[in-house]
Amino acid sequence: MGDGDFGKLKTLNKLEQLRTLLPINIQLRWCHLSKRVLHDILPRLTSLRALSLSHYKNEELPNDLFIKLKHLRFLDFSWTNIKKLPDSICVLYNLETLLLSYCSYLKELPLHMEKLINLRHLDISEAYLTTPLHLSKLKSLHVLVGAKFLLSGRSGSRMEDLGELHNLYGSLSILGLQHVVDRRESLKANMREKKHVERLSLEWSGSDADNSRTERDILDELQPNTNIKELRITGYRGTKFPNWLGDPSFHKLIDLSLSNGKDCYSLPALGQLPCLKFLTIRGMHQITEVTEEFYGSSSSTKPFNSLEQLEFAEMLEWKQWGVLGKGEFPVLEELSIDGCPKLIGKLPENLSSLRRLRISKCPELSLETPIQLSNLKEFEVANSPKVGVVFDDAQLFTSQLEGMKQIVKLDITDCKSLASLPISILPSTLKRIRISGCRELKLEAPINAICLKELSLVGCDSPEFLPRARSLSVRSCNNLTRFLIPTATETVSIRDCDNLEILSVACGTQMTSLHIYNCEKLNSLPEHMQQLLPSLKELKLVNCSQIESFPVGGLPFNLQQLWISCCKKLVNGRKEWHLQRLPCLRDLTIHHDGSDEVVLAGEKWELPCSIRRLSIWNLKTLSSQLLKSLTSLEYLFANNLPQMQSLLEEGLPSSLSELKLFRNHDLHSLPTEGLQRLTWLRHLEIRDCHSLQSLPESGMPSSLSKLTIQHCSNLQSLPESGLPSSLSELRIWNCSNVQSLPESGMPPSISNLYISKCPLLKPLLEFNKGDYWPKIAHIPTIFIDLESQ
């Protein structure tokens, strides 16, 4: 199903006995039900028992939509953008199932939901709304999925309501727990009896607690059933967690998160939770040490026997990580330590299953004692200079590499003390290196045959020697004045290297793509490019103001795409480019500043006839003769060309299938004769052409299927007879003076009509009221101001 769906669903008018309507194959990103479906078609299907509007992005529904649909038993609004349910939903006395999951804009339910006396299944998981009081009055409700309770200052009755709901399934969130007064009140929630809740979130916010013992008692009584699988505790205000949190009886608990318990000074004994796979501990500001208590007291089971991912973050006072050395974390695959500025203790030494290690913002943490990481694939270090030292010290690095024989990716960021990286001893398994913000780094000359897949250097001042890499990115290396691209490199990107002057290429380079951005002192491309880079297919130059010409001999013959932007001297000397020698060139883009008018008046600039896509900005001397020579041209983008009017009058290549005219301020009309020559044109887009007042009354190409007009402030109308019978889509956007559409109506071929920000036109197109509505009502997809009609 797609936008509007009127065309597909209008036949339902004749199916008054239809019992089930479940649209499938919804386009997830942008799909709406039209007003014609909601107002005219659905209310006629009075025999419907099951209706799904899932994934449609409508924000509003007619308030009386369900008045005539009283037989509905199943209704699905999941994944919609609906903000409010129609009040008429409360007349659906036969409704048994209502699905509202992932309705992220829905904030409340209708007040009289208790009238749904037969409602048995309600799913509000991941919806924005909070569960209202009156849901407890739904006596037939057997299954409530994804309930979210927001407690307030008068929370006693709310906890009682929660306690009365024995039919909770899936996820349950309880927010505002700071309003719970004592143990007796939290006991009313009856949490242990909620056997079908699998995901539980408990959240406190606001002021500090008056009594930490009371806070612990409250959490103690919120102990869930042992069937729980995921548990989130956020903002807990006690100083210590209750004992149940680490009880091995929680044999199904897989995912646990403890965050923002800023007064808590110890962690619970979590090591004996038998199935725990994912553990996050964040924002526990009073924790100074992870002690033996964290691992639990059992002597027969390895602590954290099932844990696969462990994250510590924002632990501002944490200093020591106590290690048992009893085989803890035997299957741990990912370890992340982030924002622990005082952590100085060592990590567990034998993490043989670890595949990804991330250390960030831990300035005191050191890895001077090698740890066993025999299966490590990814190692990321950021803002942790003492960890970075391990790469600087060849002996220490060699020792550590003995335990990292499977390493694939190395990422080092902002380790300012890092001065060297012993490339010669890097393992052959290493394929990706990213180094950023290490200003003192000087790479040694590689002496082995290591060849990476990716190498990225950002903010490293002197990368004089580089290992071979298939993909190479160098950015913001401000002290770099000359650069040799090594062999085996296939794609190269060089950005923001302010002092780069000389760029050269090693023999044997198989480069296919070269991008250079913002290197304003670079005065030339590598010499002998044609011979040294025979495989180059893509060249992009952006803001390289000192480059005046291409190398002697020209560009490589196999070049297919050339993009030149903000390279004034180079573009003004384009007569010497000799692009006509490039038989494979398909795509050419030139973004200029308009300074070529005097320099190249009367130019004779040649391009190869192989070009299929041409994009031009601010090029004043582009001629019609040159364009006509491009006999294979399919796409033309013309932005701010003062001569655009004459180019259209003199004619464009008849091979064009797509033409975009942007910001051509002198364009006042579209010449009929010039357009009629474009017999293959499918898509015409006109934008920001403020002098354009009208379209030709006749002469639009008979092949045209899509017409888009945007930001043309002086355009007043569309031609009475000028829209071709082939047109299937028309878009008009922000044309404030357009006040009419053709009186004869739209071509019958049109299936998509989009009109937005046209204030004079909008009243004429109002759904079921506007004067022009009868002439467009047959069009399957209509959007007026982004609203489906």
Model-inferred region functions:
Residues 1-4, 13-155, 163-181, 192-213, ...:
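Predominantly recognizes leucine-rich repeat
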Residues 7:
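Calcium-binding acidic motifs and repeat modules
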Residues 10-11, 188:
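Extended Gly/Ser/Thr-rich low-complexity repeat segments
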Residues 158:
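Conserved nucleotide-binding/hydrolysis modules and their immediate coupling elements
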